[in-house]
Curated annotation (Swiss-Prot):
The gene is trpA. The alpha subunit is responsible for the aldol cleavage of indoleglycerol phosphate to indole and glyceraldehyde 3-phosphate. Belongs to the TrpA family. Transmembrane segments: none annotated. Keywords: Amino-acid biosynthesis, Aromatic amino acid biosynthesis, Lyase, Tryptophan biosynthesis. NCBIfam families: trpA (TIGR00262). The lineage of its organism: Bacteria, Pseudomonadati, Pseudomonadota, Gammaproteobacteria, Chromatiales. HAMAP family: Trp_synth_alpha (MF_00131). It catalyses: (1S,2R)-1-C-(indol-3-yl)glycerol 3-phosphate + L-serine = D-glyceraldehyde 3-phosphate + L-tryptophan + H2O. Pathway: Amino-acid biosynthesis; L-tryptophan biosynthesis; L-tryptophan from chorismate: step 5/5. It holds the Pfam family Trp_syntA. This is Tryptophan synthase alpha chain. It is an enzyme of class 4 (lyase).
Amino acid sequence: MSRITERFTVLRGQGRKALVPYITAGDPQPQVTVPLMHAMVAAGADILELGVPFSDPMADGPVIQKACERALAAGTSLLDVLAMVAEFRRKDQETPVILMGYLNPIEILGYRSFAEQAAAHGVDGLLTVDMPPEEAEPLAAVCKEQGLDRIFLLAPTSSPKRIEQISALGSGFIYYVSLKGVTGASTLDVDDVSQRVAKIRHYTTMPVGVGFGIRDARSAAQIASIADAAVVGSALVKRIEQYQNRPEVIPEEVSALLRTMREAIDATENV
């Protein structure tokens, strides 16, 4: 059982939902990332999602695009991100870590080399936003060999066939993108998300995480009442951007926002 599956199993047994924060690794400086990861776990994060900075993050909105620019300007590479995970693992062997990003850096390293190094450094799962499931089998196969969960996105427009396809090919959990468009996009329609998550559950037993559009404690709690996990990214990355010139305060500032989300989710669960 992977760390991701184990975490969802434990949470389900406790009647709790996962809080999954996203940050771009190396933003605003590489030395901030690992302390921030530990701070987010202390603030109530159940699974961590690390963005691998890329020069053309087409699925991301302006907030995460700027984060990628800052991380790349600071010299952050895919190998640096793997080293950050290894450093995190020296103190935390329990919290699952997912890498989220684009295919190009992985292709440059090579599928097998990437999967072997990712597993050796303590990565638990991979989500590549620009690789459709029709093309994913070679990378998914080497990830499976190394015990890495292969996580896929579902959109509001995804068909039942696509849901079944991703359920068969993926593992860990399904990531439902609650809004059309890029990360950081507009208003969250909770009723629509509820209906679509119910539809996804009809075709799979995998946990369902929902991301895009979670901005604050209220929206995090709303999503957690529907799905197995609330994934929050742009709101945290905005906080990092706000304090980019005071990197020493970033772990506490981001954690403060994350704690409000954790408290709201837990309060909803206890109603």
